[in-house]
């Protein structure tokens, strides 16, 4: 296909302590450093566990990590404790249905958050 300049992002469900949940430890399904440029986590239910973040960082071995999907935005305390996320993506309309205007403003107004501002 002659595809060049691609980044391969691996995004896994973040491990959770919810009975019947389908998420498992990241290492169980990680394909390996030779196949992945960026490691990601899908985090819902405000389940931003420090141990899971640390596990992903250890697995990444210096590669970037991202919140490939989230329902609730990580708040400032979480982002201060977990500063290595290179981006976050709020799934579909969850930006409005799962976050208050105050929560959205808190995250998007942080100096560390880059956004596209209209001219």
At which residue positions do the language-model features occur?
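Extracellular structured ligand-interaction cores
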Residues: 5, 36, 85
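Acidic (Asp/Glu)-rich catalytic clusters
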Residues: 28-34, 58-59, 79-83
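Active-site-adjacent loop/helix micro-motif of nuclease/hydrolase catalytic cores
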Residues: 47-54
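Aromatic- and acid-rich polysaccharide-binding/catalytic face
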Residues: 26-47, 91
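Active-site beta-loop-alpha junctions enriched in small/polar residues
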Residues: 11-15, 41-46, 70-73, 90-95
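Aromatic-lined carbohydrate-recognition surfaces of secreted/lumenal glycan-active proteins
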Residues: 1-24, 62-73
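Substrate-binding cleft of secreted/luminal carbohydrate-active enzymes
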Residues: 63-119
